[in-house]
Design a protein with these regions (language model features):
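A short alpha-helical cap/connector motif
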Residues: 4, 8-9, 20-145, 150-171, ...
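Hydrophobic alpha-helical segments of integral membrane proteins
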Residues: 13-18
């Protein structure tokens, strides 16, 4: 099967597996008790202000696993909820994640939560300004998750796109509920000649999912 078809099938599988709701997805993507404990603690601490929902987290994990991603990048790690879901998927593929968080307090929480979840061997936390740190990273990525300042989405995309592998996935969060805050980012990815882009909404917040086809 062609590699682009494998990636499209991975996306379809992720949508189906998560689309059945939380109970269905829990049955299909179980977490170890240690990690579930950390996720629950983050949810309680953030008091309903999670960077991503549980449904979105499960979607990320399933998409990582089914696309067989190996080198992932997250911009906007917050306190680690999404990084842990991504890390669980990467543990299944043998991959690694670099996650960036600007706020020093949240970056510290992010590192602590990743450690408590037992994912320090998979997830590397980079605190500080992502615009400054991105040029210092080596290599390319086959999975990118963007959940940072919405007004800067286009700029982040332009920085990362040259390092996105062919058939790699670029995901951006909040494209439904905060669409008016991200300027013309969606126009760029929807009309880009080298991307196939769709919008999914596991939880109502929405994600754009773009695959590099050239």
């Amino acid at each position: 099967m062609n590699s682009w078809r494998v990636t499209v099938c991975a996306l379809a599988a992720a949508i189906v597996m998560v689309g059945g709701g939380s109970a269905a997805s829990q049955a299909q993507t179980p977490e170890v008790p240690q990690i579930q404990k950390v996720l629950s603690a983050i949810k309680a601490q953030d008091k309903g202000q999670l960077a991503v929902s549980e449904e979105d987290g499960r979607f990320l994990r399933v998409l990582i696993a089914t696309s067989k991603a190996k080198r992932a990048l997250e911009i906007g790690g917050a306190s680690g909820y999404s990084a842990i879901w991504i890390g669980m998927g990467l543990r299944e593929t043998g991959g690694t994640l670099v996650t960036m968080e600007y706020d020093p307090v949240r970056a510290k929480e992010l590192a602590e939560n990743v450690k408590r979840a037992g994912l320090s061997d998979i997830v590397t936390v980079v605190p500080g300004d992502a615009f400054a740190h991105l040029p210092t990273l080596s290599g390319s990525f086959d999975f990118v998750f963007l959940d940072a300042w919405k007004k800067d989405y286009k700029r982040f995309f332009e920085m990362v796109y040259p390092r996105l592998d062919p058939r790699g996935l670029f995901l951006a969060h909040n494209v439904v509920n905060k669409r008016n805050e991200m300027g013309d980012f969606l126009d760029v990815v929807l009309k880009h000649p080298a991307l196939w882009t769709t919008i999914v909404s596991p939880s109502g917040e929405g994600m754009s999912v773009s695959m590099r086809v050239k």
